A protein has these predicted regions:
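Hydrophobic alpha-helical
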Residues: 16-81
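Conserved H-loop
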Residues: 5, 10-11, 65
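Structured segments of extracytoplasmic/periplasmic soluble domains
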Residues: 6, 33-37, 58-62, 82, ...
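Alpha-helical scaffold segments in soluble metabolic enzymes
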Residues: 54, 82, 102, 106
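Conserved beta-strand scaffold positions in the cores of enzyme catalytic domains, especially
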Residues: 14-17, 70, 91, 126
Length: 155
């Protein structure tokens, strides 16, 4: 059984929890099953890139983006394109550059025998269609400005 701690009054809004084993196709199929099992489903939250994008693909294929909100964790070029086309309403993005910088900095301190922090929260950012092209968010989504197209997302 999964834990619902920290959700407060929202815990009863969760109708199911499924695991895709970090596989896009499995997430896609599980999402199709959830949409069939729960015809009044209002939202799907994916907790990593695979579950998020797989779910978004299934919602898009079912043309259910106006009925089911999709939010996720982690970003990719495909996730950004799915957000541009109204499939994702939000994605939580890690601050990877800061994570790497702080990780190296603390490792150097450790190797020098200096005091270092063992646990550091490098932060994350909620990205939405409204803020995705602000300067700060673009740096998180496109750190090296490489963009690959993932098929025709308009159909």
């Amino acid at each position: 059984m999964y834990k619902r701690q920290g959700l407060g009054s929202l815990k009863d809004n969760i109708v199911d929890v499924v695991y895709c084993d970090s596989q896009y196709d499995k997430s896609y199929e599980l999402t199709k099953e959830l949409m069939k099992k729960y015809p009044d489903l209002k939202m799907i939250a994916g907790m990593n890139e695979y579950s998020s994008v797989g779910a978004a693909r299934a919602v898009k294929a079912a043309k259910a983006e106006n009925r089911i909100r999709v939010v996720g964790v982690d970003s990719s070029q495909e996730a950004v394109q799915l957000m541009e086309h109204g499939i994702f309403q939000g994605i939580v993005v890690q601050k990877a550059f800061k994570m790497g910088y702080v990780g190296v900095r603390e490792t150097v301190k450790m190797l020098r025998g200096e005091d270092y922090k063992k646990n550091i929260n490098s932060g994350c950012q909620l990205v939405t269609p409204d803020n995705m092209y602000t300067s700060e968010i673009e740096k998180l989504l496109f750190p090296f400005n490489t963009l690959k197209t993932y098929g025709d997302l308009t159909s």
